[in-house]
Amino acid sequence: VINSTACGLIQEARRHPDKIGKVFAGRDGIIGALTEDLIDTSLESDEDIARLRSTPGGAFGSCRYKLKSLEDHRAQYERLIAVFKAHDIGYFFYNGGNDSMDTAWKVSQIAEKMGYPVVCVGVPKTVDNDLPLTDCCPGFGSVAKYVATSIREAGYDVASMSRTSTKIFVLEVMGRHAGWITAACGLASENVGE
C-alpha cells in the first residue's frame, strides 16, 4: 500500500512539472529528511515508478521515529527546514499512521513559525484503521481480508479435529486499541449468528 501511494504521488507530480520540479523521498522516512539522505525519484524511469504499484514492502524504507516537541528540540526542526531550503522543497507529503500525521502537523507548524512556505500533507496509511475522520485507511482492507481468510481457514482446521481433541483456537492480531482488525475476523463467518 505504501508503495502504491508513492507511485501515485510521484506520477501525479510528474504530470505537473510547473508546480513540482522533483520528488525526493526521505530514506527511512523523516530520518532521511533530517539527515539529508534523500532519494531523487526523477532519476527513475516512468516504468520503474509504475512498478512500485505492485512492489511489496516500502521501497524507500520506513521508521518509527516520533519528532520531539518543538519547544524542547527546536534544532531538529530547524535542520529539517534547512534541508527543505537546500533542495527547494515546497511540498511535504508524509505517509503513515498516527505518528506520521502528527509529524506532518508538527512540520507545518514549524514551517509557519519560521516563515518557510511548504505545504504539508499527511497521507493516511495504517492497518489499525484508527485515524480520526478517516473511514477506511489504505492498508486496512488488505489486513482485513488476510485476517478474515486466515480465521476461516483456521476454523476449518479446528472443525476437522476429532471429537476428543480440544477445539480451542486463539489468534492475536495487530491493531493497538482500535479493534478494527479483530472486527474484520467477523467477515470469516459463513452463516448469520456465527
Language-model features: where?
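Glycine-rich oxoanion-binding loops at beta->alpha junctions
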Residues: 35-90, 99-100, 138-139, 145, ...
